[in-house]
Curated annotation (Swiss-Prot):
UniProt xrefs under CDD domains: DHDPR_N
GO molecular function: 4-hydroxy-tetrahydrodipicolinate reductase; NAD binding; NADP binding; oxidoreductase activity, acting on CH or CH2 groups, NAD or NADP as acceptor
Entries under Gene3D superfamilies matching the protein: Dihydrodipicolinate Reductase, domain 2, NAD(P)-binding Rossmann-like Domain
Protein task: Catalyzes the conversion of 4-hydroxy-tetrahydrodipicolinate (HTPA) to tetrahydrodipicolinate.
Subcellular location, record wording: Cytoplasm
Pathway: Amino-acid biosynthesis; L-lysine biosynthesis via DAP pathway; (S)-tetrahydrodipicolinate from L-aspartate: step 4/4
Organism, scientific name: Bacillus cereus (strain ATCC 14579 / DSM 31 / CCUG 7414 / JCM 2152 / NBRC 15305 / NCIMB 9373 / NCTC 2599 / NRRL B-3711)
Active site: 155, 159
Residues the entry annotates as binding (S)-2,3,4,5-tetrahydrodipicolinate: 156, 165-166
Protein name, as recorded: 4-hydroxy-tetrahydrodipicolinate reductase
Gene: dapB
One GO term (biological process): diaminopimelate biosynthetic process
Residues holding NAD(+): 10-15, 99-101, 125-128
Amino acid sequence: MKEIKVIIAGPRGRMGHEAVLLMERTEHFNLVAAVDYKHGGEKISDLPGMPALHAPIYADLHTCLDEVEADVLLDLTTPEVGKQHVTLAVERGLRSVIGTTGFTEEELTRLTENAKEKAVGTIIAPNFAIGAVLMMKFSQMAAKYFQDVEVIELHHDQKLDAPSGTAVKTVELIRQNRESKQQGHPNEVEQLAGARGANVDGIHIHSVRLPGLIAHQEVMFGGDGQMLTVRHDSFNRASFMSGVKLSIETVMNLDHLVYGLENIID
């Protein structure tokens, strides 16, 4: 396979560290630079626990793109920084794979239009774990037969956004096979604000943040005399790397934006 030159934004995070290791062990991936505002001017190998890769680190993406030739930006930063980075990547005509979440429908619409206009491949993935993508697809299938559903997502206590992008994407897929319906008793009253969780078109999402967790989600369907639960668990961040690898390889052949890995797997 042809070499793919990659820039990683956010190499010091746990996902970023796993992605650097992915670069090291994948023959056709070449890590040409990284972006980290705290370590501009250093090299990847200077960071604690990193392999002996000598890709330069830039403090900002603008400077990096001015000085480095790359095929793909892999962004594993924070929601706000990720939004800035993907916008800049599209403007510069650079393919990108975005692992941050928190995009609004309006932001996705604007990015989709811009990527189409520039004919630049872009993948935004709420979750890179293949099992999580299948969990979302199975939930979408089940919604055709079970109209009563709630989502419980559980993540580590350092996660910045709630609900998770995976939960929001799951609900979006379920809505495609489910008529709008308010879940629960029509006259129910919350004795404490937020007791029933977030409400998206009548579907409740409950967010848990605790140390010891990584990324987990249950989609619970209820029917007459039965329950169906679709669950996925990521026990470490290595679980996301197969999806990262697939996304980097796939985005090379795209000329538009794709939201969600379910749209690129068979």
